[in-house]
Amino acid sequence: MDDALPRHPDTTATLLLCGRFGDSREGLKPLSPSEFRDFARWLEARRIALGDLLHKDAKSIFRNYAKTAPLCERLGALLRRTDDLALARERWAGLDIWVVGQFDPGYPSRLRRRLGFAALPLLFGAGPRELLDGGGICVVGSRDSSPRGLEFSRLLGARCGREGMTVISSDMRGADREVVGAALANNGKVVCVLSDSLEKALAAKRYREPLAAGMMAFATPFSPEVNFKVANAIRANKYQYALSDIAVIVETRQTGGIWLGADENRNEGWVPALVRTDDVMPSGNLALLHLGLAPITRQDVKDCASVRDFFVQRALARGRGAADDRSAPAARPAGPHPLPPTATASFDLYAVFVAELRRFAATGPHSDAEIAAHFGLDIEQTRRWVSRAVAEGAVHATAAGVRAG
C-alpha cells in the first residue's frame, strides 16, 4: 500500500535520524527523543526543514550544530542509512503499516497541538489514519480489572459502538480489550494505541475484519516490531488521552501506568475525565474522585437516553465547576512555567461541544435557545461558541437557525 510509505521528506529524515531498523552497528545509535528535539528546535530557529537534510549540504549543517566531531559523524552516518530504510519501508508496506513524523502535515493535529515535543518523533500505525483526528472517548483500565469493571467496559463499549462514538483504548487485556471488542461487535469505530508489537496486533484474527472494513486504526509511537516494556506502556498512555474528547478510567490502583496517565491528564488538562464508581472499587478510583474527577456508574451508562449527551453534559458541568473554582481567590504556586488552566479547559470543552453540535445540527435547524437547552448552557456562552463554530465552518447559520455543514 502506497500510503504506508513515508512520502514527506521531513518524515524520511526523521526516520533516518531516529528510526530503529536494519542492523544496528555498535556506536551508531539513532537519536534519542531529547536529542532529536534539541536538533529539530535548532533547525527550526534557522528555518531549515528536516527534509532539507536530504538535499542540502548536510555536512556543513551538522558542523554548525554539533559541538563535537563524533556527533557530526554520527548524524551523517544516520542519514546514510537509506538502503536499510528502503528495506524497512518495503516490509511496512507489505503489512499495510503507515508512518508519519512530527513535522509531516499528515501527523495527527491533536497530538501536535496537545503533546508537542512531549510526543515521540515518529508515529506508526495501520488502518484509516483519519480516525486519529476524529476524537472519541478514551477508555482505560487495569489488566486485572474486576468482573464489575469488565462488565462496565463491555456495556460502555457497546453503547459507544451503537451510538457512533469512537472508542480510543489499547489492546491490553482486561478493561481495554473488553471495551474495544464490545465497540467493534456493535459496529463502532476504534482507535487502538499500542505500546508494543504492532506487527503482532495486525496478525490477530479478531482485528482482521474491522481493519479491512475501515472501522479500526492502530497507532504506536514505537517501532512496529518492538517488544513490551513497562516504560513504553506508560509513555503510550498520553496518546490515548490526547486523541480523545473525554476519558473514562474504569479501574486503577494508586500506582502504575493507568494511574500515572490519569494523573498526567489531570495536570495537563488535555480532556475532561470521569472515573467509574461502585459500592466496591479500587483505591485508585476513590483517590481520583477525591482529586476532583467526575463519577460515572454502570447505571449511568445503562439508563441514559444518549451516552453522547451524557458525556457532553458531564464535561460541560465539570468545566463550569472548574471555572467557578478559578474565579475564587486562591494562592497560586510559584514557578517558571505556570499552566494556563482556563485556556486549556475552555478549548477541550469547546471541542466536545462542537462534536455534539454537528450531530444536533443535523436534526435542525435549531435556534440558539434550543441549542442552549440541549446542552444545558447559558445563552451567552451558547452564542459565543455557536458563532465560533460557524466561523470555523463546523456548522452553518441560516435565517431559520443553525444547520449542519
In which residue ranges do the predicted regions lie?
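Glycine-biased, small-residue-rich flexible motifs in mid-sequence functional cores and linkers
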Residues: 1-35, 44-47, 53-57, 76, ...
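Helicase-primase coupling helices
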Residues: 40, 57-60
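Alpha-helical interaction/regulatory segments in DNA maintenance proteins
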Residues: 59-100
